[in-house]
Swiss-Prot record:
Subcellular location: Virion; Host nucleus
Function of the molecule: Mediates the nuclear export of encapsidated genomic RNAs (ribonucleoproteins, RNPs). Acts as an adapter between viral RNPs complexes and the nuclear export machinery of the cell. Possesses no intrinsic RNA-binding activity, but includes a C-terminal M1-binding domain. This domain is believed to allow recognition of RNPs bound to the protein M1.
GO cellular component, one term: virion component
Subunit and interaction comment: Interacts with protein M1. May interact with host nucleoporin RAB/HRB and exportin XPO1/CRM1.
Protein name per Swiss-Prot or TrEMBL: Nuclear export protein
Family as reported in the entry's similarity comment: Belongs to the influenza viruses NEP family.
Organism: Influenza A virus (strain A/Korea/426/1968 H2N2)
Pfam families per UniProt: Flu_NS2
Biological processes annotated in GO: exit of virus from host cell nucleus through nuclear pore
Amino acid sequence: MDSNTVSSFQDILLRMSKMQLGSSSEDLNGMITQFESLKLYRDSLGEAVMRMGDLHSLQNRNGKWREQLGQKFEEIRWLIEEVRHRLKITENSFEQITFMQALQLLFEVEQEIRTFSFQLI
């Protein structure tokens, strides 16, 4: 993962953790957890691609990796919709900027995971 993506994840997670969204803070914590999970999954796919011969290892270690890949894309789509919803309802400029950057990052990560998965197939 390039250093810009790493710092983007860290920055967004830090800023999201500082937000107070009232009764929806549980939802925000869930989003933060999913962002962290997505980052770890993206990192592991990237490492597998860098080793290129790791496809067999990946398949042996987890025969359901394609199913997991599909689940990750569903999570990304859910996060995109959730971030879009938050963006529509917030009037706080700090939150708007954070959610816009989170949305941009989700699109970038979705594309990177797609690219990695095609290289592994």
